[in-house]
């Protein structure tokens, strides 16, 4: 059985993915729709809302953090990888109550479910770099 937070992360990835594809969507309506479609699952709705809005409110800062930790060879992320990295980066910087191991593991599991064949290895590598370089991140801007 999946934890309520795992389900919240899965649904957050779906909302962030939709938002990335069409920035015109109304976030509140999309969140409501995703929750309604998944009401049979146990879900931490408050956490779901916090992570979705937290990522979107801080999107430019989060993207800078990700970009600093990605190899120049990988110049373009697919939408799923990007959504997973954005969510996990937000948790690394903002959710100090969650151990880094949990954040990395959740990112890897989401990549295995939704990403391409080797996405989970890529996600693991980038999240590890972000955590390693976390002390160089100016949190006051976040």
From Swiss-Prot:
- Read off the Pfam families from this record: NusB
What residues form the membrane-spanning segments?
Answer: none
| Coiled-coil spans in chain | none
UniProt keywords (A-Z) are:
RNA-binding, Transcription, Transcription antitermination, Transcription regulation
Q: Which GO terms describe its biological process?
A: DNA-templated transcription termination; transcription antitermination
What molecular functions are annotated in GO for this chain? RNA binding
Which Gene3D superfamilies has this protein been placed in? NusB-like
One GO cellular component, as annotated: cytosol
Classify the source by domain of life: Bacteria
* Family that this chain belongs to: Belongs to the NusB family.
Q: What does this protein do?
A: Involved in transcription antitermination. Required for transcription of ribosomal RNA (rRNA) genes. Binds specifically to the boxA antiterminator sequence of the ribosomal RNA (rrn) operons.
List the HAMAP family hit by this protein, alphabetically: NusB (MF_00073)
Q: Which NCBIfam families match?
A: nusB (TIGR01951)
Q: What is this protein called?
A: Transcription antitermination protein NusB
- Organism from which the protein derives: Buchnera aphidicola subsp. Cinara cedri (strain Cc)
Species lineage, top-down? Bacteria, Pseudomonadati, Pseudomonadota, Gammaproteobacteria, Enterobacterales
